[in-house]
A protein has these predicted regions:
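Bacterial Sec-dependent N-terminal signal peptides
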Residues: 1-28
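Low-complexity, Pro/Ser/Thr- and charge-rich linker/hinge segments at domain boundaries
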Residues: 30, 226-250, 336-375
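Aromatic (Trp/Tyr) and acidic
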Residues: 47-193, 242-243, 249-331, 345, ...
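Surface-exposed, short loops/turns at beta-strand junctions within beta-sandwich domains
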Residues: 198-206, 318-323
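Short acidic/polar inter-strand loop motif in beta-rich domains
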Residues: 215-221, 332-338
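Short coil/linker segments at helix-helix boundaries
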Residues: 452-484, 521, 541-558
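Carboxylate/His-rich catalytic cores and anion/metal-binding grooves
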Residues: 475-499
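Solenoid-like repeat scaffolds
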Residues: 620-626
Length: 828
């Protein structure tokens, strides 16, 4: 006798009742062995051990409308990688699949008895990284798309007293992870499916329904569903999972649903919504929904299409200020994930999580409890045998920097060609990139922003503990974190003041290796004026902040170093612009150098009060080369140091840009302010994941104008989970966050990703996954509808392997995110 499989579903929980095994699977295991012919491929399942592959399982069931039931189904999982000592077997076949331009073997694959086993990594080739594998069975989508494979019945609803089929079935499906070694040109993946059943009649609140779907061959062949929208989380209700301060002047959530091949659901306006206390389940606030953006209206950002493909309804509860933990529920539809309204569990918590993400990028020290749950040995330290050689190539002329002359074709060519035998023993520490382990001076944008927070609210941030190794010293933790990233460049500063632009290996990381297992040659970039300007500006800011908090002796060290770097950079700059080859310098490099020169001049003038830097700032000030960072400094200088007209120009620069951002936010369905005019949304610009533009912070601090604060808060909603995916775009935050950022250390050692990593996020797939590319082909094949047809606001694929979505950078993602959240926590 076979035991039927049922689930009981209510309050967003699924309880299996009577499930011993799946009899549908047991009837014929062979037909589910879909990988049997592909076991020689990387990422395929392990050889058969007689263990049954698990069927797809139901993760959540809820309505998106009173007559549309959404069933969320997950399929397959990945067996994590692990590193073990390599013990050679006579049957092993070793293949070198990649070498650096120097002939360094940085990818050695092991095949044992015809089966791909893993990669040999690390010094001495003593470690084996076992390949990840897929486990489980994919959803039979043909069965899932057939309305005849579903029945709904209920003894409590006369409309459903007899079994009925849905009148239509729609679906959207997406990959949710790729095996690490199968991420490029691969075929294996895990998946998530949203199945929408268009019901013949409206459901009745409080009534239990039995939904049968045996032909889908899931972990249960039927389930009971209690229709109680005030308790069940609905995919259609989008709220920030970070929450709000009580005095935040703007608090919104959203309602929308794009049903894949069913299109966007059209909701009536004036729906009632409520704020419900998570503890008491009592209604605390009620309001009426209003139309935010219609699905047929193009947005004024990105490629100026509609980026949601569904009506976006706004749920405004700005007038609700009572501290507590809540969920927002829409009448007849369902609820959001829970969120807090208070001063400690919201922006401050998010700020601390983001700062922990920055800490987890430290190089040169071991990472382990109690400072982080991510465990990693010390990386790239000379005492462990790592040698860093001087290159004659500067970051200015590297493809990893500005590639000023356009001569670097593969990012590493000029660096490696400039190799010398000179060792740079001081080249350790700093903060690493994401999928790579470089430390480039561009990362100092984060240190600059952290120091700015300290400068704006020293009394607030001096007491914030970030739980880092320096927490017991006499500096605020925020300053310590900024200085850790900065100090490597001071240690590498040349006696004449020149600043090296960072540290880089000869190639991208070896497959399967971790940061403490580098086998490639490692180089320090040669000094250049661009890198020296960046350093001079941030070091000057460090000195200024140290003076503010009373650390005058430490401030002197940084001031001397900053001035020395600037005085070296100026004649180098003059030589650069007067040499014959300057005409060949690409325009973007000229602009970037001018920007950093202008900013460094502003920083040094504020710090030293030396008029030569004031003259340089004013001489280099223009629309292209003055960032709001520099204008923000100049606009706040003591009146005795500036001409009133010049200071007004600085202030106007900030406010004009902030006003443009306010306007831009109004032209976006979700109020985004990180878009760059004329560019598609997403990619390295991280349009969706960076909460807001720092310019809005500066405008609000200067004026106190609530419009800027409201725009900040509105823009910060999307990345906090108030988006069509209900996904927080930073690891470790909220109840549903990104799981698979491109973080090689954890991926290759079977650990969860560290918290605090803000990924690049969704993008306009047609732009960033070009026709004919690997990602375009995979997403079009693995998604329903095709991945290139998805709305960009929902086009985040948490697959680890797509750098334009799953990666992040210290200076572009982590720094600005912590800065925005830190300001929202501290602001007055």
């Amino acid at each position: 006798m076979q035991l039927k499989t049922f689930c009981f579903i209510t309050s967003a929980f699924i309880i299996l009742t009577g499930y011993l095994h799946n009899p549908l699977y047991a009837q014929d295991k062979s037909k589910y062995d879909i990988f049997s012919s592909s076991r020689e491929k990387v990422g395929a399942p392990l050889p058969s051990t007689g263990t049954e592959q698990s069927p797809p399982w139901i993760g959540n069931v809820a309505t998106i409308a009173p007559d549309v039931l959404c069933i969320e189904v997950d399929a397959c999982r990945i067996l994590s990688s692990v590193q073990i000592p390599y013990q050679k077997d006579p049957a092993d076949i070793l293949t070198i699949i990649h070498s650096s331009s120097l002939g360094e073997e940085n990818a050695i694959r092991v095949v044992r008895n015809g089966f791909p086993l893993g990669m040999i990594v690390g010094p001495g080739r003593k470690t084996l990284t076992i390949f990840e594998r897929i486990a489980g069975i994919h959803l039979n989508t043909n069965a899932a798309d057939n309305p005849a494979n579903y029945t709904i019945i209920s003894s409590g609803d006369n409309n459903y007293i007899h079994k009925l089929m849905p009148s239509a079935v729609w679906r959207k499906s997406k990959p949710t992870n790729y095996p690490e070694e199968n991420r490029h040109y691969g075929e294996y993946y895990t998946a998530k499916h949203f199945i929408y059943l268009k019901l013949p009649y409206l459901l009745k609140p409080g009534v239990t329904y039995l939904v049968s779907l045996p032909e889908l061959e899931l972990n249960c062949s039927a389930f009971y569903y209690v229709y109680d929208p005030s308790f069940v989380r609905s995919e259609a209700v989008h709220a920030s999972q970070i929450g709000f301060r009580s005095d935040d002047p703007e608090k919104n959530a959203f309602l929308s649903s794009w049903m894949g091949n069913g299109g966007g659901y059209k909701y009536p306006e004036n729906l009632e919504f409520s704020i419900i206390d998570e503890k008491t389940n009592e209604k605390q606030f009620s309001g009426k929904a209003v139309m935010q953006w219609r699905k047929d209206d193009p947005e004024g950002i990105g490629t100026k299409v509609n980026h949601t493909q569904a009506d976006v309804i706004r749920l405004d509860f700005s007038n609700f200020n009572t501290p507590g933990k809540y969920r927002i529920c829409v009448e007849g539809i369902g609820c959001s994930y829970p969120f807090y309204i208070d001063s400690t569990n919201t922006w401050l918590k998010a700020f601390k999580v983001s700062m922990k993400g920055h800490f987890n990028q430290r190089s040169g020290i071991p990472l382990l409890p109690p400072y982080t749950d991510f465990v990693r040995p010390r990386s790239f330290h000379p005492e462990d045998g790592v040698k860093v050689y001087q290159s004659s190539c500067s970051l200015l002329n590297s493809g990893n920097g500005l590639n000023a002359l356009g001569t670097d074709k593969d990012n590493f060519g000029n660096l490696v060609a400039g190799r010398t035998d000179e060792l740079v023993p001081e080249a350790w520490g700093g903060t690493m990139d994401a999928g790579d382990w470089d430390r480039r001076i561009k990362h100092l944008n984060s240190s600059r922003l952290y120091l700015e927070l300290m400068e704006l609210y020293p009394d607030y941030f001096k007491n914030i503990c970030l739980n880092i190794p320096e927490s017991d010293n006499d500096l605020p933790d925020l300053v310590d974190e900024a200085l850790y990233g900065l100090d490597i460049y001071r240690r590498m500063q040349l006696p004449d003041g020149g600043i090296r632009g960072g540290i880089e290996s000869s190639e991208h990381p070896a497959e399967g290796s971790a940061s403490w297992q580098e086998v490639l040659s490692v180089y320090a970039y040669a000094p250049d004026h661009w890198s020296s300007y960046i350093y001079a500006g941030v070091a000057a800011r460090a000195a200024y902040v140290l003076k503010i908090i009373g650390k005058t002796e430490q401030a002197k060290i940084w001031e001397e170093s900053a001035v020395k770097a600037m005085k070296w950079a100026e004649p180098e700059y003059d030589r650069w612009i007067n040499e014959p080859g300057f005409s060949k310098v690409v325009p973007s490099a000229k602009i970037q150098v001018s920007i950093e020169r202008n900013l460094a001049a502003a920083e040094l003038y504020r710090l030293t009060k030396d008029n030569q830097w004031d003259e340089l700032y004013l001489a280099t000030r223009n629309v292209q080369t003055t960032r709001t960072d520099a204008a923000f400094i100049y606009g706040r200088l003591d009146k005795s140091m500036v001409n009133k007209k010049d200071q007004k120009i600085a202030l106007d620069t900030i406010l004009k840009k902030a006003d443009r951002l306010v306007d831009e936010s109004m032209r976006s369905a979700y109020g985004l302010t990180s878009a760059i005019p004329g560019r598609a949304l997403g990619g390295w610009e991280s349009t969706y994941s960076i909460p807001a533009s720092p310019t809005l912070v500066r405008a609000h601090f200067l004026t106190g104008n609530a419009t800027y604060l409201k725009t900040l808060l509105r823009s910060a909603l999307f990345s906090a989970g108030a988006n069509p995916m209900n996904l927080v775009l930073t690891t470790g935050l909220g109840e549903n966050c990104v799981q698979h950022p491109l973080h090689e250390d954890t991926r290759h050692t079977g650990q969860p990703a560290p918290i605090g990593l803000t990924v690049c996020g969704p993008c306009e797939v047609p732009v960033f996954a070009k026709p004919g590319s690997d990602m375009r082909e995979r997403l079009d094949l693995e998604c329903t509808p095709k991945g290139s047809e998805w709305p960009s606001a929902e086009s985040y694929f948490d697959v680890y392997g797509w750098d334009l979505e799953n990666e992040y950078v210290v200076d572009r993602n982590l720094g600005p995110t912590a800065y925005i959240w830190g300001y929202l926590a501290a602001r007055r």
